[in-house]
Amino acid sequence: VNTGLFNVEGIPSTEGRAEYGGTNNDDNSGVLKYVSIRHGGSKLEANNEINGLTLAGVGRGTEVDFIEVYANLDDGIEWFGGAVSVKHAVVSFCGDDSFDYDQSWDGLGQFWLSLQDEEGGRGGEWDGSEASDLNPKVSPLITNVTFIGGGLTTVNGDNNDALRIRN
């Protein structure tokens, strides 16, 4: 598990509220339930956009359930480490990947649906940690998932993939 302190991707390091991390995977940040996030996101600079829902270092004591992200500029939901579970999530027509995790997220994903059009990204982009000495690199449990892509007419050829797994 990542135990250092990091900054949320895209937010300047001078912004203290963008810092996350630590050693408490049981952290409870409250409840996020029955939420629809629509037409969100923002392009801060080249290759630096805001996700529909960013979960950075959020602990397993937090409840995230029945979430919809629709037509976001970048990823629908992205995790940066942490151990929060996300159940009953629908991500549709986003500009990049539907479900994207990085930096050794260690939670549960269950009952997910991704629907992308020809301009969207993959159903999932799943990465572990870039630290070569971190074990396990990534160990979430993901079940009951459906990815529906844009088909063979996607604008970006690599977006034909339902899922990309690295690290």
Language model: regions and residue ranges:
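Beta-strand/loop edge motif enriched in small/polar residues
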Residues: 1-167
